[in-house]
Amino acid sequence: MPHNVVLTGRPGIGKTTVCLKVRNVLEEEGYTVGGIYCPEIREGGRRIGFEIVDLTEGDRYLLAREGASGPRVGRYGVFVDNLERAAESIERAVKRTDVVIVDEVGPMELKSNAFVDAVRRAADAHTPAIFVVHERSRHPVVVDLREERPDVVRFRVTLSNRDELSDRILEHVLEWLEER
């Protein structure tokens, strides 16, 4: 039975919301969940960047911000050093938690080789992982997760399925956790 879950979908459709709903229920059931997610930073109703949130420790640090130095993705400069911290968070979660969430594996996050390596190791580990991946990226690690790995169940988040999708993912992850 596949132990990895991959979510895709257009920006703003609710992929992070689905992940966080799954996390909340798993924790209510007594499971530990670690990893990262990358919410927007808004100022005056306008998106000005993104941060990284460590789900285990609760730490927050910048992923990207308008006008920042560092590798560029659109109008944002990416903080590669912080992605290396995110990679460490993922590695820690693989070793210490029941389920790992990596939201997102997208153009900004892929600027760090350490992050890419951590994603690969998380996918290869025996710990179930939920990955949010960029829908159109051709990066090898994204293509592998989105299209090629046999140990992945894939879902595309849409307006019509996003409300019940967390239940389907939970059912899959809980079944896997109970079988191991």
Swiss-Prot record:
A UniProt-annotated Pfam family: NTPase_1
Signal peptide: none
GO function terms (MF aspect): ATP binding; ATP hydrolysis activity
Keyword NADP attributed: no
The reaction(s) this protein catalyses: a ribonucleoside 5'-triphosphate + H2O = a ribonucleoside 5'-diphosphate + phosphate + H(+)
E.C. no: 3.6.1.15
InterPro entries assigned to the protein according to its UniProt record, in alphabetical order: AAA+_ATPase, Nuc-triphosphatase_THEP1, P-loop_NTPase
Keywords of this entry: ATP-binding, Hydrolase, Nucleotide-binding
Residues annotated as binding ATP: 9-16, 99-106
Function: Has nucleotide phosphatase activity towards ATP, GTP, CTP, TTP and UTP. May hydrolyze nucleoside diphosphates with lower efficiency.
Family of the protein in this entry: Belongs to the THEP1 NTPase family.
Protein's name according to its UniProt entry: Nucleoside-triphosphatase THEP1
